[in-house]
Amino acid sequence: MKHIVTLSGSKELLKSLLFGFAAILFIVLAPALAHLANFPIYYIEPMRLMLILALAHTPKANAYALALSLPLVSFLFSGHPEVVKMLIITAELTLNVWLFYFIFKKTSRTFISIFLSIILSKMFCYSLYLVFFSWAFFMSETQTVFLISQLIATTLFSAYLYWAMNHKLSFKK
């Protein structure tokens, strides 16, 4: 019996490691994909996309690990985002994961939990942009087209996580 539990744990660890590797690879390749597609990939928030997939399909610890590592990996491989912005994004993504689990524990509603956690963590992020950067930078980050794309992405991410968690596709936390 002990062997079966260990094997199951190893399988989940392998799944988390493979997912983490794929997420990091996607983030490293995102600038090249944006160039090839001639489309601003950041509109779909690649780091948050990886975070949503991690929340849906891997253990909680993996979502936190990706929230903490994806901005750093992006910085190390591409120099973007700059250091202060990287730290803000790291805090935002980590807060996003924490808020999701906190709200979900209170409501048991996946869609509302992820939707609110994304919105609240974005508000936190934009507040820090105002503190650490100029008003002009803040305004460039909150252009109408970008905000609309974020609202669409947030809705799609929330719908996906709702679907995955309610169709037994998610990892049992």
Regions from the language model: what does each represent?
Residues I27-Y43, L70-F100, L130-F137:
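Interfacial aromatic-anchored transmembrane helix boundaries in multi-pass membrane proteins
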Residues L49-I52, F75, V97, Y126, ...:
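Hydrophobic transmembrane alpha-helices of multi-pass small-molecule transporters
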Residues E82-L87, F102-K173:
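Membrane-embedded alpha-helical hairpins and interfacial helices in multi-pass inner-membrane proteins
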Residues M1-I27, L87-L130:
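Short helix-perturbing small/polar motifs within transmembrane alpha-helices
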Residues K2-H57, A61-N62:
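Hydrophobic transmembrane alpha-helices
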Residues I44-M47, A91, S121, S149:
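Residue-level micro-sites within transmembrane alpha helices that shape
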Residues L55-A67, F104-F111:
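Membrane-helix interface "capping/anchor" motifs
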